[in-house]
Curated annotation (Swiss-Prot):
Organism: Acidothermus cellulolyticus (strain ATCC 43068 / DSM 8971 / 11B)
Functional pathway: Amino-acid biosynthesis; L-arginine biosynthesis; L-arginine from L-ornithine and carbamoyl phosphate: step 1/3
Keyword Protein transport included in the entry's annotation: no
Transmembrane segments: none
Main location: cytoplasm
An example molecular function term from Gene Ontology annotations: amino acid binding
Name under which the protein is recorded: Ornithine carbamoyltransferase
EC number: 2.1.3.3
Amino acid sequence: MIRHFLADDDLTPSEQAAVLDEAARLKKDRYAARPLTGPRSVAVVFEKPSTRTRVSFEVAITELGGQPVVLDAVGSQLGRGEPIEDTARVLSRYVAAIVLRTFGHDRITTLARYATVPVVNALSDAYHPCQALADLLTIRERKGGLDGVRLAYVGDGNNVACSLLVAGAMAGLHVTVASPAGYQPPPAVVARAAEIGEQTGGRVEVVDDPRTAARNADVLYTDVWTSMGQEEETAARRRAFAGFTVDDDLLALAADDAIVLHCLPAHRGEEITASVLEGPQSAIFDQAENRLHTAKALLSFLLDAAGGRGIP
């Protein structure tokens, strides 16, 4: 059966846990899974610039035995207005899966509707589910588990925050998002995460005070205040997010053994200070590495579901 990964809850909680288990296994033995041996190809389509997402997926596909085929808007007909549904049907004839990083979430849902191979959301304006998998793996490594871990996200209630709410609830985390009024996660996403938490023991909360969120947190997480495509809002966002910087004072409110996460790229001196990013509690570069291992595990899972020799 063809499965897509467009939002975090396209996996069940048990499937999410299985993907994390496989990612941990592949981190220890990077060539233990070869579901793309042939090589089979995977299309990696970027309508939005990337460093970590692009490199992690290209390396993941290669280490799984496959061949990445990288497309961007400039070098393909997508940039000239070819309908995404046509692209979906054509690429499905060539490749084993399609990875898309885009702006509007409707782009990826349309792609999945017309594709006949698995589709992976490598980032949309609504969700960043691949990032959340890497975040959970990093937390599990550092904390020895996920159930009951207190995660405080401080900053823009963006795609990263939305995925942390949903994926965190699925894993049994207690997730608190601190964002100023007007920049909080969509109520529908918060409600969905709360609904999931009722089944898993996870809890979610949205507040407007970063100190409230950070107090006794096991994980302190932040992201940029201004995402790609929002550059005209930079000045207004800096004003709105004044007081939301993850600095030494905010970190001091968290648990003594708290870790700090950031999905990168970081703007030192804005959402996070250099001293925290480079400090002993930072797990940020382990987190970046885990994008690779979780990408491999996710692709293996989706290929297995499609009958393509994925997770053993």
